[in-house]
């Protein structure tokens, strides 16, 4: 809007003031503003009578004065209205005393058009000096020293004065006015003061009027009381403007003048409010930009940076609980709409860590497009510190990395202003103040209260200091409490115990509350404690806590006042580091400069939903600060009174947005590091410095001159360099009308040359000066008015300065007019390529104790999906390391390890990444993965895990090129290789991990027992000799052993030497139980041993006890147990009320025996004996009773030779229930719990009711309340006795109780879930790819549940099932809003169903034949062709190896087709080669084709044998030739070898003497040497011979003419043939022609025929025919049968004609391609015409939500783009896109028929009720999904899902659903939770909504 025209004097003052604003104190500007505001009352005199004028002015002034006093005192914590009248008059206030004399800006001493800073300061000093006499008089009245003096804009000074004395000051001669100093309450007053925002408001009155800022975030609450404009008359976006936009866009709506437009892009509805319960990120961001609160309490009112700016609510995060991330399609739509509707600035406080800078990224491309439209983009840098800070995400480097960047995408966008975070000086937070009512006051100090319910729990309580045994402050142990704690507030020290335990023990001691004193000895508050919320607790710093302890010790019986409230307190973090420790480091990984600038982002107070407020931290808070500031800058540019308005008006597009960014960076103030001698903070951390909004506006109003690097960027990017002298150029632009000269500052701190350093004690990164380094200008810096000057500078480094270090700093320039320019610079001295891309095994990041195993191989068991760390060994001290010689897996399906993959700790972002498996000779076996880029590893604070690169698994199989089948690789040594190029570098790095494929188990021999006696104790060992010929015996030395069936599953072996034939002698100690089981005689031994590949040998042996000479009876398992129960090994129950007990053992002879039953009767045992092994087995029946039994074993059947006697007790009587009742006998309940009661038999030990152990009373009775869920609940009750016998009873109880009727109230069938559902043509049973219709079925929980999808009420059947259809089309991301409600409750919740699909397979056209074999003698075969798809991503595999892929993060809704040119080499094997080529799109639709190639090495064939028909003189001679081998063809030449042709079957008829050459050829292109055969026996000039020669030449001339007329050959050779034909005809016409002349003419003509070149060579023909086949398939029947009006033929017929022409070869490839292009253009036009004709205007003019354009525009754009394509394959891709569009439009038409809308969405149903207003549901803003695999547990295994594969058949279009994955697993604990809160940096991932923080589509191989 236009600003109101100011009075001339004010305008001039404002203009002149520009020269001094760089040195003008903020106080003077505020003084001017206060005076202006509080003297407006005098204007009333112009509108009232003289009689009333005085009274009106007096009343107004009094009211204004009282309000100003009250406001000022409120800021100091004093309630003016509660003071009595005497106190009100006596209290001191701050005032501004203004002099009668004019200030320097108005007294005529300065030029109104231009004055230098020096001149302004000189005149200002004169004005201030003249104030001396007045100041003296004022000080006499106030008894206070005068404060700050002003002389430029205001002639006056500040002072303190009692209210009663204010009139006295007004009476002093020379005093014009006395004005109350105004109090400002911005977003965070301290944050804005850091950036001088108030000065802009005050001096320029810029508050964002007429500007629009787009908030692309989680949503805005437009009803918040601070979301307002002071005046909505002259807004940029009116309601009418918005309605015009929404009429076109077909989405979004107008809300109010402050938030004129909003739309929920994630859920496709108008619910723009974030329903997250804990915190609303977008609302906080919106408040920082433009809240416009009123009132004096900063905790209850917020004013943003640009409070009068309008805000767009572009909600891109769903209200669904299923996802806290967003995707490319959603973001791009919001960005594009922001630009279309006219946003001046867009803010994105979101991103995914460590991004790249490529326009292949759709978000970065969208940002650039927005810039080009003139919308500035401001984006947060990220909250991850450095990649070297391990789990902390702060300003540290524990690994010594050269590449520590973490700036996120889309913040890496070149044109965006990327913002780092500084700490706020003060913070509004919950704080405690402790007073005794007299002299003690502790605080206010920031605290963390266990629950807000306890704010009053500490007030007026007594305190109790808990002391330990030494009399020191206790850490809260139970034993340290006494009875004195009861009812008091206990005070303990931090440490040893968990916070929860401290609370528990204090509560148990009867304390009323707990205060935990920090233990670090500092004043740092304790604000990150894991407290329970059930007991009043908070913490104090060490300093404050000790003061409290001391006071309580002196006043043990006194109570204290404790006030806990929101309070403005100093930010402790600011005193430790002015920058926020979490702010992400730059630069971009290619050494581009980022971040750009810093703003306050740490501890910012801003708005929340429902008129709420909260404190949040993050670059998410810093970014909106800059967005608001750029709105102010844009307002300044729009000010027609600005002296540079004419220049600003012509700025458009990126020129405008770059200018705003440059001005802010040029005027930013570099921050110094208070912890390291005030050196600079690295530009890689702070960018250009802290924003100074006042300085930026000053520049725009006074002198908008700038300095940039040679490439136009407002920072110097030196990249990497190796010379100690580095030159660079700066461009200075003077936009004033006067010449400017600049001097570079020589401050030894700010302007020194710096490099990075690491504090060895803390790991903190800081900058240090490079001694001897300097930067000098090559010439004086003089810039003519209105011109630019390019100046060369030289950076000089000392020769001793080591390479591989950053070099950085700031260049500051002072202009001749006093203006200043700031420019950061940064580069890398050394080779950026050199830094490793991946950490090595056991490398710098390897820290098992911290849960980080770094780079590590993973071995997977396919049956269970469990993963294990490969080669992991543990030394004697318990340290784990990876032994790279022990990494192995087996191709034996029975082995534990069935495949290998790698989890890489990437140290850098890398591009052109390839993962290969190599054999022992370094030959490539397969390529597992090929991708454009991979992101470095970092710790994601939101998901609490490291984000690794999980590379694909190899299962030991390979593609056999000979037959096209998958085969198992041979055992041997292999290499797992990753290679890639570091971003910003150009050299490929390789990292190899060796491993072995071993399918053979180790061999074991000579199993025996040995014994050693140590300290009087005999230790027995199981010994053996073992050998493994490949992977080696298990490096962990783990074995399993059994002695007489007593097992030891955790045994280990030791090496005891090596045999001569290479066996390792091993010995394993027996456990005590195994030793006890040993007997004299044959002991059964079992040794289970594996190799490193997990192949197992299970060796059984019979061993003798060392030293034994007798053979005693041995019963396995240590003998018959003392008790036989249902849990005893060997017992097996039967159905007759008993069972059988079986035992076994060894004895050198048969064993017999007896047993006694329950009645004491003796019976014979059932025994068997194996003489070969000396083993026996015996069994005895037992009954379900408790009784004593005896077992006797004998050496004879007569039972005379007793071997052993056993006494045992049979204990098989199970416990019993009496009077067992479930729910008092009822099967139904409406309660939350049911009661289970009963009595059990006396021998019962425990009763388990579900998961609860019931308490038994003295009568063995129990009663348990069991919670039940809605629906059927099966309740199990199990009684267990002392012997382990159990009895179980169960009952099903149906519960109608449901505390949350809406929780889990809707479930879907066939795998459909709320959130993202991603599928392709064949992977979803609910979807029909032919129609594009999805049929969604499911069930609701209650009959009262209601379900609304996309605005339509879904009918619920009587059986609670439902079914509805959605038209999804064939491609895109389609969100549908879902509202679930219940008719019995007045509430709903909102969810979303999002479908991400591609139902169209890519096309694949190969240049080589796929129908007939190809033969070659060249081992290097090139596969060429093209692939297209309806979306932009394609990947290519050849022979199962992934060889190429495109940028994976695509906008699937862009409508842009995909295209890939194929040109891949393949090394051929000798003989047959089956080459399988497959292309796959973004949703795993795959098209496959095979090429069969036969290859034989090039060789020289044996020469053919030539035989003449006669050697006698003859008229003709027939020459026949035979090849030396079968399969060869003999060719001849009659023209000396110029041309050859096949020898006819009948031979070559020769009519004239001459020399003929013959050679043999084969299919592979091999040839023999040519042999000459000279014909000399033709009789000359024989009339018959002459006639024959004429006839032969006549025939050949006729043949030549036929060939010339065929049109198959190119012009050059056809012309040569015509000339040869004419020459032959001339020879024929000669009357004196001889046989020789005719033969020569014949030979020349034959040569010309042989040299004819086909218009369409064979390879081109094959390629074209394949291409035509693909086109015909894409057209399908309906489109192919339509007629081209220009030709009258169907398109299929036209293609058939092309096929015929290609087969005939009468046109060149270019001609045929041109014709094909015309056909495809006609097809595109016909298809577009048909779509448009079938689309009613109301639908065609409606908006496609995916593209933001009308359907008609989508059709036209796709048609135009397709017809503009030069390549037929591109046209085919656009045809696919148009076909996909056809499906979408048809769906929109169908929807319009039903509900009257045309945007592809549905509106109000005519049956199911109206469009619901979705109620928000919780989401989790700022959470990155860990998208690259889960982490192994510390125990060494990772549970995962088994990998699957799906093969494809020849030339089939198939779906690939089973790509190998590395699995999912449990996350290892990584130590104590970080003590800083999540900072709201929104993680973004795409389409599976997708993995690790976020924006990115799923990675193909993960």
Curated annotation (Swiss-Prot):
Active-site residue list = 217 (charge relay system), 281 (charge relay system), 620 (charge relay system)
Which residues would be cut away as propeptide?
Answer: 34-187, 1871-1902
The subcellular location is: Secreted, Cell wall
Instruction: State whether keyword Glycosyltransferase applies.
Output: no
Gly residues: compositionally biased ranges: 1797-1812
Recorded GO terms, molecular function?
serine-type endopeptidase activity
Q: What's one GO-annotated cellular component?
A: extracellular region
Motif LPXTG sorting signal, chain ranges: 1867-1871
N-terminal signal peptide: 1-33
Principal place of residence:
secreted
Per UniProt, what is one Pfam family of this protein?
Peptidase_S8
Q: Which residue range or ranges hold the Peptidase S8 domain?
A: 191-697
Cite the Gene3D superfamilies for this sequence.
2.60.40.4070, 3.50.30.30, Immunoglobulins, Peptidase S8/S53 domain, Subtilisin-like superfamily
Could you tell me which residues belong to the region Disordered? 1796-1874
The family database entries (InterPro entries) matched by this protein are listed as:
C5a/SBT2-like_Fn3, C5a_Peptidase, Ig-like_fold, LPXTG_anchor, PA_dom_sf, PA_domain, Peptidase_S8/S53_dom, Peptidase_S8/S53_dom_sf
What reaction gets catalysed by this protein?
Endopeptidase activity with very broad specificity, although some subsite preference have been noted, e.g. large hydrophobic residues in the P1 and P4 positions, and Pro in the P2 position. Best known for its action on caseins, although it has been shown to hydrolyze hemoglobin and oxidized insulin B-chain
What GO biological process terms are annotated to this protein in UniProt? proteolysis
Keywords tagged on the record = Cell wall, Hydrolase, Peptidoglycan-anchor, Plasmid, Protease, Repeat, Secreted, Serine protease, Signal, Zymogen
Keyword Protease assigned to the entry: answer is yes
Q: What topology does the record note for this protein and the membrane?
A: Peptidoglycan-anchor
- State its Enzyme Commission number(s): 3.4.21.96
Summary of the function given for this chain in its UniProt record: Protease which breaks down milk proteins during the growth of the bacteria on milk.
**What protein is this chain from?**
PII-type proteinase
* Organism this protein belongs to: Lactococcus lactis subsp. cremoris (Streptococcus cremoris)
